[in-house]
UniProtKB/Swiss-Prot annotation:
One Pfam family it belongs to: Ribosomal_S14
Domain of life: Bacteria
Gene3D superfamilies for the chain: 1.10.287.1480
Encoding gene (name): rpsN
Sorted UniProt keywords: Ribonucleoprotein, Ribosomal protein, RNA-binding, rRNA-binding
Organism: Microcystis aeruginosa (strain NIES-843 / IAM M-2473)
Assigned protein family: Belongs to the universal ribosomal protein uS14 family.
Function comment: Binds 16S rRNA, required for the assembly of 30S particles and may also be responsible for determining the conformation of the 16S rRNA at the A site.
UniProt GO MF annotations: rRNA binding; structural constituent of ribosome
GO biological process, one term: translation
GO cellular component: cytoplasm; small ribosomal subunit
Description of how the protein assembles with itself and partners: Part of the 30S ribosomal subunit. Contacts proteins S3 and S10.
Protein name per Swiss-Prot or TrEMBL: Small ribosomal subunit protein uS14
InterPro entries: Ribosomal_uS14, Ribosomal_uS14_bac/plastid, Ribosomal_uS14_CS
């Protein structure tokens, strides 16, 4: 199990990312279309003033049950350990052990 503080920190980042998503994309579009260098500097400064945790690159996928950040399967939203347990118990529809 991951520390609760880490899971809560990740939830806070998700809220911030959602809150500033529109403003960030708007500023990036303005930056892309700006022709003057001073204008680009001003837009870049505005981007820098946004909260650091609102950037999408700060997002870390975590397991829904354990909060584990490593070994994450996007299709299920689970870590490899929980995925294996749940698959053995038959809790994931359509998942079968491979055999060849």
């Amino acid at each position: 199990m991951a520390k609760k503080s880490m899971v809560e920190r990740e939830k806070k980042r998700a809220r911030l990312r959602q809150k500033y998503e529109a403003k960030r994309t708007e500023l990036k579009e303005q930056f892309r279309t700006a022709e003057d260098f001073e204008e680009k500097l001003a837009i870049h400064q505005k981007l820098q003033e946004l909260p650091r945790n609102s950037a999408p690159s700060r997002h870390r996928n975590r397991c829904l049950t354990t909060g584990r950040p490593r070994g994450y399967y996007r299709d299920f939203g689970l870590s490899r350990n929980v995925l294996r347990e749940w698959a053995h118990q038959g809790l994931l529809p359509g998942v079968v052990k491979s055999s060849w």
